[in-house]
């Protein structure tokens, strides 16, 4: 649905402008990035390609775009932070246990992450029927089907042998018992504070020393109130995976931009696959676009080289359109 909305947005070109030099550099939170897009937070990325978090972090640092590490990543805050050059973003699924929350924030800050992204749009676990039908599980179930899939994907299998079976590396240290991976998944899920409120945001605001972005907003009233608590809002419907009947962020973007004015930063994701999509988001009022699936699809196809190629294609498309 997100992509259908994007496909129905058209930009009318204007010509006779003389020589045009496209400048993609974008300033956000007093840092200048080389493009107006970054890598969105995606949980358990290493299920798709072993070592994915580290590959994406290294790429983002090399090409000077932000990479957002998820709370439910397969690599630790510290290990990924080493490759981000003090310009990483950390996405927080707010834990119920405030001691864990405070420790996560300290670890992220001490590891050089400069922007905190707080996810607000998971008050309940959604029914993801496609995942159920596909048999997706964490950890992966070992059966004839997965053995066959591993056999026909030798590079993925070799990567698993090198990096090990994906784990909740960021949350593992808080697991008191030495349970198996299934129990660790249950523990990580049990710690997610599904009912986020403004008081919780205020508490985080008093702890975190850098910019804070609130992710998952879709309503004008929430966006207006958020101005008093955070430094930017991040319009998202979780890539269409959380609530099927919610609108696309692109549909609500123009009105929210009108209500917030021109100066308050708006970030957007969900359905953005190409440079054309990025330009559409910018023209409708976003300051920055976050992209997820294209990078992990490219990783699954060609590993780190694939992610780098995806970045090149998206950036080249933006320059071409401009």
How should these model regions be labeled?
Residues 71-74, 95, 195, 214-220, ...:
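Glycine-rich beta-to-alpha transition loops that act as phosphate-gripper elements at the mouths
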Residues 63, 83, 111, 207, ...:
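Structural motif
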Residues 1-9, 251-268, 273-322:
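Alpha/beta catalytic cores of nucleotide-metabolism and tRNA/nucleoside-modifying enzymes
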Residues 78-89, 144-150, 194-212, 244-268, ...:
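Alpha-helix-loop-beta-strand connector modules within alpha/beta enzyme cores
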Residues 39, 60, 118, 204, ...:
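Conserved, mostly hydrophobic/aromatic
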Residues 1-123:
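N-terminal capping/small domains of soluble enzymes
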Residues 1-30, 139-196:
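An N-cap/entry alpha-helix motif that binds or orients negatively charged groups
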């Amino acid at each position: 649905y997100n992509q259908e909305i994007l496909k129905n947005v058209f930009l009318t070109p204007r010509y006779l402008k003389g020589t045009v030099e496209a400048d993609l550099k974008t300033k956000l939170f007093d840092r200048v990035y080389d493009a107006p897009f970054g890598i969105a937070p995606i949980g358990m990325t290493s299920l798709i390609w072993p070592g994915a978090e580290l590959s994406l972090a290294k790429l983002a640092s090399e090409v000077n775009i932000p990479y957002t590490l998820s709370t439910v990543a397969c690599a630790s805050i510290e290990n990924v932070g080493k490759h981000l050059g003090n310009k990483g973003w950390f996405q927080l699924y707010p834990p119920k246990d405030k001691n864990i929350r405070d420790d996560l924030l300290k670890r992220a800050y001490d590891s050089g992450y400069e922007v905190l992204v707080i996810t607000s749009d998971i008050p309940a676990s959604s029914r993801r029927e496609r995942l159920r039908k596909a048999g997706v599980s964490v950890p992966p179930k070992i059966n004839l089907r997965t053995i066959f899939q591993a056999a026909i994907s030798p590079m993925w299998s070799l990567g698993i042998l090198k990096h090990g079976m994906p784990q909740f590396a960021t949350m593992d240290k808080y697991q008191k018992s030495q349970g198996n991976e299934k129990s660790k998944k249950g523990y990580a899920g049990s710690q997610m504070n599904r009912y986020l409120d403004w008081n919780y945001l205020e508490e985080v605001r008093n702890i975190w020393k850098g910019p804070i972005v609130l992710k998952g907003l879709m309503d004008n009233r929430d966006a207006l109130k958020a101005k008093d608590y955070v430094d930017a809002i991040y319009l998202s419907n979780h890539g269409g995976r959380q609530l099927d009947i919610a609108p696309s962020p692109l549909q609500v973007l123009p009105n929210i931009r009108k209500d917030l004015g021109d100066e308050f930063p708006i970030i957007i994701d969900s359905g953005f696959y190409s440079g054309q999509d990025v330009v559409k988001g910018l023209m409708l009022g976003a300051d920055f676009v976050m992209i997820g699936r294209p990078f992990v699809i490219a990783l699954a196809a060609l590993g780190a080289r694939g992610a780098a190629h995806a970045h090149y294609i998206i950036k080249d498309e933006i320059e071409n359109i401009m």
